[in-house]
């Protein structure tokens, strides 16, 4: 029986750990690839910035390009006052992009295809933005729940709707990212399996098509990290700027 395209998303235990308060904390393939993503990002930045030079080398150029891209994204969505949160936004972008890209490699696993992982990342953003909002605006941050010009009789309903929308942010962020990663990797698996079954793997046209598809998936992996980053900056804008 042929393997399902969804088998690539199965959580597999690598080694067991004692339960904590009844919760299973076994080290899984998802844990492994999140650790690999973290190490990869740290090494990439360390190697790129270890020997800074006026004329940057290849890795330094990439690190500086990503940094400048993050700065530009923050400035365009939050403003100069948002630049103090570059470490947060940079880390989120790099971690998600690396997790997405590692899943494309042979024998790789896409940690961001699981809602538990993407929801955890989204909650980091949600909690951080909420804390930053109260830090910058104090109690006035709650104005985000009541749009200006709202009639008094409509205020209770609007507060309820806006509160629901605000609390739904991490849910929408996590579902969007996980769903896109599942869809992209599943399509590649299905088409690759079809090519192998038809015994046309070595013919030029299917090979070219698969290469193009993988290239597109790399683009989508980076694009999803970018979209998540932009939405994070939009939420930061709500927290930093008074309404």
UniProtKB/Swiss-Prot annotation:
Q: Where in the cell is it found?
A: Cell inner membrane
Q: Does the keyword Heme apply?
A: no
| Function, as annotated | Key component of the proton channel; it plays a direct role in the translocation of protons across the membrane.
What protein name is recorded for this chain? Answer: ATP synthase subunit a
Q: What membrane topology does this protein have?
A: Multi-pass membrane protein
A Pfam family reported for this protein in Swiss-Prot or TrEMBL: ATP-synt_A
Keyword Transmembrane applies: yes
Q: Which gene encodes it?
A: atpB
Going by the UniProt record, its keywords in alphabetical order are: ATP synthesis, Cell inner membrane, Cell membrane, CF(0), Hydrogen ion transport, Ion transport, Membrane, Transmembrane, Transmembrane helix, Transport
User: Transmembrane residues, as ranges?
Assistant: 29-49, 54-74, 89-109, 114-134, 144-164, 182-202, 208-228
Q: Which InterPro entries match?
A: ATP_synth_F0_asu, ATP_synth_F0_asu_AS, ATP_synth_F0_asu_bact/mt, F0_ATP_A_sf
Query: What GO molecular function annotations does the UniProt record carry, in alphabetical order?
Result: proton-transporting ATP synthase activity, rotational mechanism
Task: Give the family, as the similarity comment puts it.
Answer: Belongs to the ATPase A chain family.
Subunit description: F-type ATPases have 2 components, CF(1) - the catalytic core - and CF(0) - the membrane proton channel. CF(1) has five subunits: alpha(3), beta(3), gamma(1), delta(1), epsilon(1). CF(0) has three main subunits: a(1), b(2) and c(9-12). The alpha and beta chains form an alternating ring which encloses part of the gamma chain. CF(1) is attached to CF(0) by a central stalk formed by the gamma and epsilon chains, while a peripheral stalk is formed by the delta and b chains.
Q: Which GO terms describe its cellular component?
A: plasma membrane; proton-transporting ATP synthase complex
Highest taxon of the source?
Bacteria
Listed PROSITE patterns:
ATPASE_A
């Amino acid at each position: 029986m042929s393997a399902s395209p969804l088998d690539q998303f199965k959580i597999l235990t690598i080694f067991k750990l004692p339960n904590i308060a009844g919760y299973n904390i076994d080290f899984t393939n998802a844990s492994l690839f999140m650790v690999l993503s973290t190490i990869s990002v740290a090494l990439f930045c360390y190697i790129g910035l270890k020997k800074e030079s006026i004329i940057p080398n290849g890795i330094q150029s990439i690190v500086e390009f990503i940094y400048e891209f993050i700065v530009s994204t923050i400035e365009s969505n939050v403003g100069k006052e948002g630049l103090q949160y570059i470490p947060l936004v940079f880390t989120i972008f790099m971690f998600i992009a690396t997790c997405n890209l590692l899943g494309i490699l042979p024998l790789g696993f896409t940690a961001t295809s699981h809602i538990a992982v993407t929801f955890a990342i989204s909650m980091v953003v949600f909690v951080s933005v909420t804390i930053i909002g109260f830090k910058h605006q104090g109690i006035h941050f709650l104005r985000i729940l009541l749009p200006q010009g709202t009639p008094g009789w409509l205020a209770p309903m609007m507060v309820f709707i806006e509160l629901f929308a605000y609390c739904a942010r991490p849910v929408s962020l996590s579902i969007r990212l996980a769903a896109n990663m599942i869809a992209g990797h599943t399509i590649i698996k299905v088409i690759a399996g079809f090519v192998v079954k038809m015994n046309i793997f070595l013919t030029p046209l299917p090979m070219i098509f698969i290469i193009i598809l993988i290239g597109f998936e790399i683009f989508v992996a980076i694009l999803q990290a970018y979209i998540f980053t932009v939405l994070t900056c939009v939420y930061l804008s709500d927290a930093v700027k008074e309404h």
